[in-house]
Design a protein with these regions (language model features):
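Plant-biased, solvent-exposed loop and capping regions
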Residues: 1-482, 535, 540, 568-579, ...
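Folded extracytoplasmic luminal domains of secretory or organellar precursors
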Residues: 115, 507-509, 520-524
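Residues within well-ordered beta-strands of beta-sheet-rich folds
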Residues: 410, 502-506, 529, 557, ...
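Short beta-strands within extracellular/lumenal beta-sheet-rich domains
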Residues: 467-498, 551-555
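A short tyrosine-centered beta-strand micro-motif
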Residues: 496-513
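Short, surface-exposed beta-strand/strand-loop-strand elements in extracellular ectodomains
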Residues: 513-534
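Short, surface-exposed tryptophan/glycine-enriched loops
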Residues: 542-581
């Protein structure tokens, strides 16, 4: 009998060992208690098509090399269980990623039965209820709950999770004061609480969160001033307090945040004056200080600040000229200086800018164009320079224009629409920092802003499924399209007869859905101004109309005294920004109707007709008096029968 060589024997032994290991690994299972926990969690979340088993980790083979739910794309549907199978040759659940499933249940307290769990991601579902206090006993690293229907306050027990690095609960309906205990989360790096209903002042204990890198508190109802203690967040990279309810001034301590690359502050409450913070020697992606009541001049050092995406200083009280050094900012994707008091000459480098908005300022009248490439110059000159009522850049093109009594606009529509015999003009041009005046039209549109955090550049919206509209009246075709804007949207009418006008604004929310999915949970709010007067604050289309896809017409009276009318819509930082996707927020308008209440001023022909009629009546009266006196043959007037006046009186009585 042939003997097996040592080499072959070793090879067979190695193969046998590998086969044994493979069999053992393939049979690695979840402990029964974790299986039961998953089954209970699935029931609480409202998952009907998932029955977890001991082979749950093996069924998801290949995913156990992933370490976090963040490794998936933002727009992906997720139903992922990540396991760690290297602990005592037994698998344990470490991550639950249940994203974009429209789950209708509640947050599961049963998570405490998964002792190795590090992350729970339930973003963009339809979950309701409160955040379980029981979660405070877990050793979680990441909690992500954005885009649901969660209510109630943040339980103070959450602050017991000393391992927590990220807590995301944006775009829910949470309320109440932030618990001071949150200051105990000393390991936390991300705290995202935007788009809720939180109130009260920010707890002073938050100063202890020195590891914070990203904090977002926008779209809430906080009170008090922006706290000075933010200067203690020395590792901070992103600060977002857009429309937060907090008041100014902007703390000077922001200059100490050397790692800051994303600063967004807008629409501060109160009337406190802010100075321009020192942001020199920084490299920033976003610098947004909008409507913060900032006084003073533009700072030269901004020209050396590396700003890559957006510089937005709109709607402040900035004065003086644009510094020549700002030519270095032409590489910034978007620059918005709208609505300030800037003066001097429009910079010569404007033609090199990627996208620049200088509308509504006090620049010298050395420019006759409202749009120069991608530069919006509408109303960029001082109104004191032009007393005609027409903004300077339109003055020459509409000089001597015939007066009209109405304006009708199919906002965002690519074609005109005829409704009840009235034509609504098309308004379909797209883009940011946009000014557009259609040919032979007596109106223009100006829009300001860029949708943040997405590579989207649009200013119109369309409804693909017109069956979603519940409007069946004659105006329904006006609601298939709309014009939208990230910040400010202005319609400007000119060549109008002076007088009182009825302004009708047509709205229908067409970017959210009317169902039980996360896409229905968006909230859109914006201000409406007519002739500079605020007529609607935080206007919510769906709420006013009684639901998504329902039309509503808001009517107002406006006085036109200089042949012009201005209708402006402004986003003050309120409402969700991630539902149904990022970039859905800000003003939306479907159609505009402006009509003279008196049916218009009297035409020249009508005036001639009226004058002629008056002259004839006067002649008749004079002749009648003369005849009555006997100068026209009436020698015995009492006996000569009825006069012309009597016939006239008799004729009136017979009617």
């Amino acid at each position: 009998m042939n003997m097996i060589s040592p080499y072959c024997f070793f090879l067979l032994l190695l193969l046998a060992a590998f086969g044994f290991y493979s069999q053992g690994f393939g049979a690695t299972q979840l402990p029964e208690n974790e299986v039961q926990a998953l089954q209970s969690i699935a029931k609480t979340l409202g998952i009907n098509n998932w029955n977890p088993s001991v082979d749950e980790c093996n069924k998801r083979q290949g995913r156990n090399n992933w370490s976090s739910c963040w490794e998936f794309k933002d727009d992906e549907y997720q139903n992922v269980v990540i396991c760690n199978c290297s602990i005592d040759t037994v698998c344990h659940v470490t991550n639950l990623c249940m994203k974009r499933q429209n789950l209708p249940g509640t947050l599961p307290p049963e998570l405490v039965r998964l002792p190795y769990l590090q992350e729970i991601d339930l973003t963009l579902n339809y979950l309701n209820g409160t955040i379980p206090r029981e979660w405070g006993s877990l050793n979680l690293l990441n909690i992500t709950l954005g885009g649901n229907r969660l209510t109630g306050p943040i339980p103070k027990e959450i602050a017991n999770i000393s391992t927590l690095k990220s807590f995301v609960a944006e775009s829910n309906q949470l309320y109440g004061d932030l618990p001071p205990e949150l200051g105990n989360l000393t390991q936390i790096q991300r705290l995202i609480l935007s788009s809720n209903n939180f109130t009260g002042e920010l707890p002073a204990t938050l100063a202890k969160l020195t590891n914070l890198q990203d904090i977002r508190l926008g779209d809430n109802q906080f009170s008090g001033k922006i706290p000075d203690f933010i200067e203690s967040w020395t590792n901070l990279k992103a600060l977002n307090i857009i429309g937060s309810g907090l008041s100014g001034p902007i703390p000077s301590g922001i200059s100490k945040l050397r790692n800051l690359t994303d600063l967004r502050i807008s629409d501060l409450s109160g009337s406190e004056i802010s100075s321009f913070p020192d942001l020199s020697n920084k490299s920033m992606k976003y610098l947004i200080l909008r409507n913060c009541n900032i006084h003073g001049t533009l700072k030269d050092y901004l020209s050396t600040t590396e700003i890559s995406q957006i510089l937005d200083l709109s709607f402040n009280k900035l004065t003086g000229p644009i510094p020549p050094s700002y030519k270095e900012l032409i590489k910034v994707n978007y620059i918005f200086l709208t609505g300030n008091l800037l003066n001097g000459s429009v910079p010569s480098w404007k033609s090199d800018a990627t996208s620049l908005d200088l509308s509504y300022n006090n620049f010298n009248k050395d420019n006759q164009q409202c749009q120069y490439g991608k530069v919006n110059l509408f109303a960029a000159s001082s109104p004191t320079i032009n007393n005609s009522g027409i903004v300077s850049c339109l003055r020459s093109s509409v000089s001597g224009c015939p007066k009209v009594n109405s304006i009708h606009i199919n906002c965002g529509g690519t074609s005109s629409v005829k409704v009840k015999g009235i034509t609504y003009d098309e308004d379909g041009r797209d883009g940011t920092a946009l000014f557009d005046r259609g040919q032979n039209k007596n109106w223009a549109v100006s829009t300001t802003g860029d949708y943040m955090d997405v590579e989207a550049e649009y200013s119109t919206a369309s409804l693909n499924d017109t069956s979603a509209l519940s409007s069946n009246d004659a105006y329904h075709q006006l609601y298939n399209d709309a014009r939208v804007s990230p910040i400010s949207l202005t319609y400007y009418g000119f060549c109008l007869h002076n007088g009182n006008y009825k302004v009708k604004l047509h709205f229908a929310e067409i970017m959210f859905t009317n169902d039980q999915t996360y896409k229905s949970l968006g909230r859109r709010l914006f201000h409406i101004y007519i002739q500079g007067t605020l007529v609607e604050k935080d206007f919510n289309i769906a709420k006013e109309a009684g639901g998504v896809g329902k039309a509503i017409i808001k009517a107002y009276t406006a006085a036109v005294i200089n042949n012009t009318i201005e209708i402006r819509f402004y986003w003050a930082g309120k409402g969700t920004t991630i539902i149904p996707k990022k970039s859905v927020y800000g003003p939306l308008i479907s159609a505009i109707s402006v009509e003279n209440e008196n049916g218009g001023s009297i035409s020249t022909g009508a005036v001639i007709g009226i004058v002629a009629a008056v002259v004839i009546i006067i002649i008749i009266l004079v002749l009648s008096v003369l005849w009555w006196k006997g100068y026209l043959g009436n020698k015995n007037s009492p006996s000569r029968g009825p006069s012309i006046l009597a016939y006239i009186a008799a004729a009136h009585q017979s009617k």
